[in-house]
């Protein structure tokens, strides 16, 4: 029996080289993805409470897919924008 259901590929897809095109550095990518993953996790947590403060996943997700994998796929698809935070004025 063959299955046409695609399985999530986790952290290996999308490739790091493609993800780095969306940010300035690996550090920026990590922060960017972590913040979005926290938003996705908070969205799933608040679903049962009826609150809709956060935006849910912008890509199709799989049942057991981790928020970080979802965030990386959103970044790779160009669905998110980031803004640089300026440091304190000197």
Swiss-Prot record:
Q: Which residues cross the membrane?
A: none
One annotated Gene Ontology cellular component of this protein: DNA-directed RNA polymerase complex
Listed under catalytic activity are: RNA(n) + a ribonucleoside 5'-triphosphate = RNA(n+1) + diphosphate
Write the record's keywords in alphabetical order, separated by commas: DNA-directed RNA polymerase, Nucleotidyltransferase, Transcription, Transferase
Q: Which PANTHER family match?
A: DNA-DIRECTED RNA POLYMERASE SUBUNIT OMEGA
Function as written in the Swiss-Prot or TrEMBL entry: Promotes RNA polymerase assembly. Latches the N- and C-terminal regions of the beta' subunit thereby facilitating its interaction with the beta and alpha subunits.
Protein name stated in the entry: DNA-directed RNA polymerase subunit omega
- Source organism of this protein record: Streptomyces griseus subsp. griseus (strain JCM 4626 / CBS 651.72 / NBRC 13350 / KCC S-0626 / ISP 5235)
